[in-house]
Amino acid sequence: MINISGHLREERKITGYCNQDVPLIVNCCGKQVFQTQDYFCNRKNGRLDYQIIYIHRGSGHFYLNNEWITLSAGNIVLYRPGIPQYYSYYAKEKPEIYWIHFTGNECENILKQYDI
């Protein structure tokens, strides 16, 4: 796997960060390319922040609305805070994804403004 990422803080938490003192702030973002190893994410309690995943190439498998679905290149997934996150990538499908985690007191209003 190729993993390129940037993080706001030195300390990284699997649960992410919540900051309601600012309108919007990016906690971390990155790109991952899965070439030889499969990847499985199992976050039963979700995270404290929002997450957007963009599938640039290949596909990803996501458990959404009580069913597994396969999303191909060009699709985006949004996870709100506290929403369980179950997803996987299979190296044979050559997934290349971009992701971002963000938080803030205006996040939900911004998403609503764009009907998201």
Regions found by a protein language model. Name each.
Residues 1-70, 76, 108:
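Generic protein-terminus/edge-of-domain signal
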